[in-house]
Regions:
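N-terminal accessory scaffold of Fe(II)-dependent oxygenases
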Residues: 1-149, 157-222
């Protein structure tokens, strides 16, 4: 985990698919794809078919779809939502779970800008410096194939491994008014963090402009 770098980079779906095919090191994951769901109209299928998943007194619904390179693994993390459903629609995944009491051994990092709670520990290949603490933990592995779904309780740590090519996972997350109230301190921290974060966007240059700038620089130096 590196808070000096961006966790997410926006890419077109065609570019992402090509990236997954070429990736031989299992390091690319695509998530936070709500814009894609909305622009493609797929979001309507989520909303029209999740009635039996929604809890009563729901205050917010979050939908996503995940893709990844073969054998890629998501960071170890936990969610604070009231319900967190993962539905495999293609391929196969293994989800490794840890109970909330494991938090003190997982070196939790609170990223309020992205509202993520991540551990630097890799549960699939534990780093040497974390091995001693990790040996104290017990995990549960859940394997999902197309048509199968799991509900990951709030505060349970999980990491998803994509063990087949072209795997896709539909994600449904819900907050109720009471669950939102119970995590209000974290929601306030997210609001403050976003207000205090300043982003500077660099000017985008096409290749012609870049060459001209290089020629001007060389002329000035001579």
């Amino acid at each position: 985990y590196d808070d000096e770098t961006e966790l997410y980079v926006p890419l077109a779906i065609s570019e992402s698919a090509e990236l997954f095919k070429k990736d031989k090191e299992a390091q690319y994951i695509s998530e936070n794809n709500y814009d894609f769901l909305e622009e493609s109209g797929v979001i309507n299928y989520y909303k029209n078919n999740d009635i039996f998943l929604r809890p009563s007194m729901v205050s917010s619904c979050s939908y996503d779809i995940m893709f990844a390179s073969l054998n890629a693994e998501t960071p170890l993390r936990y969610d604070m939502n009231y319900r967190n459903y993962m539905l495999v629609t293609n391929g196969k995944v293994i989800i490794r779970l840890f109970a909330p009491k494991a938090t003190k051994y997982l070196y939790s990092v609170n990223d309020y800008e992205n509202f993520e709670f991540i551990s630097p520990v890799n549960p699939w290949s534990v780093q040497d410096k974390y091995q001693k603490d990790f040996d104290k933990l017990r995990s549960i592995d859940v394997t999902l194939v197309p048509g199968q779904m799991v509900n990951i309780p709030a505060y349970w740590w999980y990491s998803i491994k994509f063990v087949k090519s072209n795997t896709s996972v539909c994600v449904f997350k819900y907050k109720t008014y009471m669950s939102a109230l119970s995590i209000s301190n974290h929601l306030i921290m997210r609001m403050l963090q976003r207000q205090n974060t300043k982003r500077v966007i660099a000017k985008r240059m096409v290749s012609g402009e870049a060459n001209n700038a290089k020629e001007e620089t060389e002329t000035q130096n001579t």
